[in-house]
Each structure stands twice: as structure tokens, then as C-alpha cells.
């Protein structure tokens, strides 16, 4: 096993010799993703948590038509249940964009869907031994590398706290290498999101909390002083080719999503801290050293609005920021990255979590679920997908898909696809049957 992982790590490093430079599609895709949508997305895939007593109660991939020219616009056209409830959370495309990987934070299963026919996704492989083979728990972020899938976990099998690591898999679903989160030189060992700037040979990671916390009821957790101490307060700068952590950045308050500027001349990224409601800029200073700088507040931090997902515009002049507990989305002018200005806000509902925007910035989509035990209860448990047009000043609602009414479950992570680029997708992958 060690020889296999070492060989895989060497192959991984060699794979970065050619750096692609094209960005399109969703603005949070890995820069190594090809076959990008350059026009109107046609389908939206929503990785959805099953709910007890609702529909088939299973986690599922829900596909919605988002093409205004379609007679099924705004309608669910496909649901693919995967069986059971394991805390469905995030997804990510392989580099050739044919396969969508989707993870569950509780039972650690990973599902690989073939999207050669995006209106009818097919489940072609389930990885059931992620925790056993890696020692990690909670496969959270799925980030494409050349011929590989980089997975950021949230926890571990021994203590279920936030000590965790990164796992690299082949596109065929075979484990290649493991990379523990740094615990020296100020590292706290926590993980959450991944963001890569290939031009700088930089992998940036953020930090959240472990299984013991994220599977706890939110109301119970916030009243537990010890639990509230178990959140990450760092981000790590890694050498991408060697997969070695080089510097730890102090970013207190659980820095979550990472969004690099997509402009080639830029060398900065944004994140938001969940517990302190702050915006942070990660950049190089005049000496070329990577630093983290607090740049602003989100809402009223004293009320703990709980910032969650963020989305950067393709021109790097705007940033969407969702706050879960007050159900609000905000848009910031970040044309001066060190001086963000809130220029728009809208109350979306009782809760809001994920946000995805088209590359041209004209269409924005929102979903509501965060984590099953953290979502609001009863009548406040909004579960929907909403689609909007954005003109730079106002959000104009186009349609809503009510996941409660349709008995689908909790709407979480979104990914775009289109049948127009199916011919460009990678060839059919051979998936070994050995787990």
C-alpha cells in the first residue's frame, strides 16, 4: 500500500507540468476542469439529503431543467436515489467533467455519477471504504486534478474530532495518496475547503470542525462551551506539486469556502469565517509572502448570522455571501479587494446556504440546507432551490422548486451541466470493482 501511495504521489506531482488557463462555467470549479459550459447552463444537479418520513427518505441527486428555452424550465426532470441517509453534502466534477463525485459526511460513502447524458445521470460506482482506507471521516470537498480527484475530509476514525487530511484518488476511484493536515508551526489539523492557484503553484485549505460537532444538534452545540472550542482557526498554504504544507495562516473563527480571483494577473482569494462573521483576504504581500488580512464584517457579528457559502464573480469585482441563520444573501463590491463594500442584501427566507452563479454573472441559484441537525425545525425548515436573474442591482426571481412540497428532502449542493458539451467529455472510464 505504501509503495502504491508513493508512486501515486510522484505521478501526481508530474501531472502539473501543464497548467490550463481557461475559466468558464461556474466560478468555483477547479481550474483543471475542461469541457466547460461557455453559454447557458441547461441542467442543475442538486445533491439532496433524505428526510425521515419524506418521500423515499433517501439521499438523492435531483436534476432540474434551467434552460429558459425548454418546456420543462424550472421543473424537476430526474431524481436518482442512492439509498439511505448518510448526510449528503458536496459534489465535484472530474477534470474531464464527465463524472460527478458526491460525498456523505456521516457514513463516508462516495457516489460517482456519469453525466454523459446530463438529463439522466447514472450511478456507476460507490466507494464504501473511504474511512477504512484513509483513516479520515467526512469526505467534504471534491476538487479536480489532472486525472485525479482531491478530497478534503473533515474528521478522523479514531477521535472524530477535527484532525483530518486530504486524500487523492484516481478518476477510476482508486486511492493514490494521503496528506495529513499540518499540526506543527501553528497548524491545528483541521480541514474544510480546497482552492488552487496553479499559476502560483499554491493549494489553499481552510478549516471547520469534526464529526462530533457537525453531527450534533446546532442548538445543543452552541450551548456547549467545549464543543465551541473545537473549530478550526487556520488556513494552510501548500506547495501544489509536492503536496507539502509550507505556511499556516491565522484566520480565527472557522474559515470556510475559498474563492480565488479568476483574473490571471491576480494572486488573491477570499474566505468568510462562520463564527466571527468576517471577510478575509488571502494574498501575497510586497515581499511575496502569503498573508491573511481581515477586510470587513458580514451583517451584525453579535447576532451570529453564520456566514456559509460565498461565490466570486468571474471579473473578481463582486462576491455573494450567504448567512444561514438570518436567511440573507449579500453582494459585496470587491473591486478593491482590501476594502469590500456591501451594495445589496435580500432576505431569502428562514435559512439559506449555497449559492452558485453563471460565469457571466447574470443567473444566480440558491439552496437552503446546511447540515440535517443544523437546519431549522418545523415551519422554519425551508427546503427549496430558487433561481434568479441578476442585473447588478436587483435579484429577479425566475422560479422556485419547493423540495418540501415535492417530498424530495433537504436541498444542498448544486452543479451545472449541459448536453451541448457532452461530446467533449472524457471517454468512458473503466472502474475497478475492488473497493
From Swiss-Prot:
<dbReference type="GO" id="GO:0042597">
    <property type="term" value="C:periplasmic space"/>
</dbReference>
<protein>
    <recommendedName>
        <fullName>Methanethiol oxidase</fullName>
        <ecNumber>1.8.3.4</ecNumber>
    </recommendedName>
</protein>
<dbReference type="Pfam" id="PF05694">
    <property type="entry name" value="SBP56"/>
</dbReference>
<dbReference type="GO" id="GO:0018549">
    <property type="term" value="F:methanethiol oxidase activity"/>
</dbReference>
<keyword id="KW-0574">Periplasm</keyword>
<comment type="pathway">
    <text>Organosulfur degradation.</text>
</comment>
<comment type="subunit">
    <text>Homotetramer.</text>
</comment>
<comment type="function">
    <text>Catalyzes the oxidation of methanethiol. Can also degrade ethanethiol, but not methanol, methylamine or dimethylsulfide.</text>
</comment>
<dbReference type="GO" id="GO:0008430">
    <property type="term" value="F:selenium binding"/>
</dbReference>
<feature type="signal peptide">
    <location>
        <begin position="1"/>
        <end position="24"/>
    </location>
</feature>
<comment type="similarity">
    <text>Belongs to the selenium-binding protein family.</text>
</comment>
<keyword id="KW-0186">Copper</keyword>
<dbReference type="InterPro" id="IPR015943">
    <property type="entry name" value="WD40/YVTN_repeat-like_dom_sf"/>
</dbReference>
<dbReference type="InterPro" id="IPR008826">
    <property type="entry name" value="Se-bd"/>
</dbReference>
<keyword id="KW-0732">Signal</keyword>
<keyword id="KW-0560">Oxidoreductase</keyword>
